[in-house]
Amino acid sequence: TASMVVAPTEEETAASGLVRNEDFYNGTAATEDADSGSPLEKMDFTTGLADAKNITFDIDYGAVTVVVDGGAAEPTLSCTNLRQDWFTFTNTGDNTSPVRVSYKVPANYNLGKELGPEPEFVLSVPDANTFHFKRLSITVAMGDAEFDNSDTIAADSIDLDLAMGCFTGSTVQAEQFTANISMGDFDLGLLAGVETAKVEAAMGDIGLTVDGRPDDYALDLQTSMGNVMFNGRTMSSTYTQTAAAPRSVTLTAPMGDVVLTTTQ
């Protein structure tokens, strides 16, 4: 028998900024977790995130997407296909600690079984003219991360850590950018304003474009079993250069290709 999840009281809902769609799945069997029969939930956090410039995702299973909503006044978070007992949302509201979005699969849970629809965590933020992350940190054990943006996502620093998944993005402005991908590809259309970028894809390819001229950067591009390409030229498996400006890009893909392009 499927266990029932008790809905929050009106007071709890108001306090947390949580909007519950009780009839999202209409209780059909196809939306239950195949292993436990637990119902899957949809949760929307629509208030209380105006000053949430420091956000951390710690996800065992699911896809994380950051989108730009040019008409939005503040960030919102929409989560679907959730096991509620695995999900935690923490927001102190005082800007002293990051907003934390956590989805932790129990250690003894058999991930080899069919888990049903993949959980999705979608963070919508206003455009870069009105919203700027101090720090955005995304850790996913099994699932992709995507910046699905036509406008720029801006941050002081961005940290990505994906064990089994790919990262794709359009345009990002960040001073510090770090990505570690154990098994998957990295593809970012434009990284602007970066001072230090470090990307490692242990078993995948790296594709990155940065703003500026080639000699604006100190470079360390390395692969063991693939090719290094810099502005369309195929280099050896290792390419390094120094620069007078304190901007650096380090890209490492031992088993894949490294492709770096500058806009000028």
Name every feature range the model reports, one short phrase each.
Residues 111:
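Acidic/histidine-rich helix-loop elements
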Residues 2-102, 116-137, 145-153, 208-212, ...:
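Short linear S-[DN]-x-LW-Φ motif typified by the pepsin-like aspartic protease active-site region
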Residues 102-108:
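Generic short beta-strand segments
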Residues 60, 92-95, 141, 163, ...:
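Structural motif
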Residues 62-68, 77, 159-168, 194-198, ...:
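Charged, low-complexity, helix/coiled-coil-prone segments
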Residues 45, 105, 167-264:
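Short, surface-exposed interaction patches in beta-rich subdomains
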Residues 135-180:
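Right-handed parallel beta-helix
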Residues 97, 156, 217:
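Residue-level signal for beta-strand positions within conserved beta-sheet cores that form or flank
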